Structures are given as structure tokens and as C-alpha cells.
Regions:
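Alpha-helix C-terminal capping/helix-to-coil transition sites in glycosyltransferase folds
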Residues: 1-2, 92
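Loop/turn-to-beta-strand initiation segments
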Residues: 2-6, 28
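Switch II (G3) loop of P-loop NTPases
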Residues: 6-12
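Conserved NTP phosphate-binding and transfer environment spanning the P-loop NTPase/kinase superfamily
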Residues: 13-165
């Protein structure tokens, strides 16, 4: 009806070709991205890609039972998909939401480190795992005990009050 709302989520949702049958004035596009705004020091910013990979490693282990090596091995394919299906359309959004939390790397550390330490030296993903372990060494770990159940971080670490699959 006239007051119905259709929510389309996913990598193709900003692409107008996917919603060509909906008039432009009836669309409101929200782009959610994790844009890390922290620096390690005055000259070295934290790469957004590293923080996003850590999120994915933790989430894939918890939700899909995927080990860190497998997630790391798929990362370049994920990045190619973003380059083709997300980034060209991100400017088409009506509003952008940065989902990064200032404290998330301190929380993710406790979940990510054991997963990264499980990557063996003889695996091709070892160098990336070693790099991420060193990167996490810049942060003091923190308990997830005080992370609210409605926090977006719960999508990755579990314990959300929302059914996020």
C-alpha cells in the first residue's frame, strides 16, 4: 500500500538496476560502512580494511564456523566484490552511516587473537594472520560485558537482542 516500506539489504541494494521498477522519489538509500577513524600515532592511521577483516574473521567463526585462514583466503574475493558492486554506487546513497565504534578493536581483540593464532605457519594466510596479531598488539583488550545488546558490534561478537542470523 501507500504506507508500506520495503527494505533491501545487501551488496546490490544501492544499484539502481536492482530497483529500476521503484520510482526514484520513493527510494531512500542508506549506506552503512565501517570507516575507522583512529590513528596508531601522528603518522599512521588504522586501515579501515584491517578493522573490517577482523570483524569478518570474528563473525565468520561465530556464525558460519569458518576458521580464520579460510576467511583470510576469501578476503581478496570479498574486496573485488566491493569494488564491483558497492563502491561504484556508494555515492548514490541519501545518507551514510559509519558503523565503527571507537572501542571495537579492544573488544574484537579477545575474539580475533585465538582465531588468528590458529593459522599455521605452513598456510598461505599465515603472513596476514601474523600481521593482524601484531596490529592487535597496539590495543589493550577489553571485555564485551559492557557492550549493549543492541550494539552493532554484537552482529560480530554475538549476544545481540536482534535476530541477525
Amino acid at each position: 500500500g501507500d504506507r508500506d516500506v520495503l527494505v533491501i539489504e545487501g551488496i546490490h541494494s544501492l544499484n539502481d538496476a536492482m530497483t529500476y521498477s521503484i520510482d526514484k522519489e520513493n527510494k531512500f538509500k542508506i549506506y552503512i560502512s565501517a570507516l575507522t577513524q583512529l590513528n596508531i600515532d601522528e603518522h599512521n592511521r588504522i586501515p579501515t580494511t584491517d578493522a573490517r577483516l577482523l570483524r569478518r574473521i570474528v563473525r565468520d567463526a561465530a556464525k558460519r564456523g569458518t576458521n580464520a585462514a579460510k576467511t583470510i583466503s576469501m578476503w581478496q574475493s570479498v574486496r573485488r566484490g566491493e569494488d564491483e558492486n558497492i563502491f561504484p554506487y556508494q555515492e548514490n546513497c541519501d545518507v551514510m552511516f559509519n558503523s565503527v565504534l571507537i572501542y571495537e578493536l579492544a573488544i574484537l581483540k579477545q575474539y580475533a587473537e585465538p582465531l588468528l593464532f590458529s593459522v599455521r605457519e605452513d598456510q598461505p594466510e599465515y603472513e596476514t594472520a601474523k600481521y593482524l596479531i601484531k596490529f592487535l598488539g597496539y590495543f589493550l583488550g577489553s571485555s564485551s560485558e559492557n557492550v549493549p545488546q543492541n550494539s552493532i558490534l554484537r552482529e560480530f561478537i554475538g549476544g545481540s537482542c536482534f535476530n541477525v542470523g
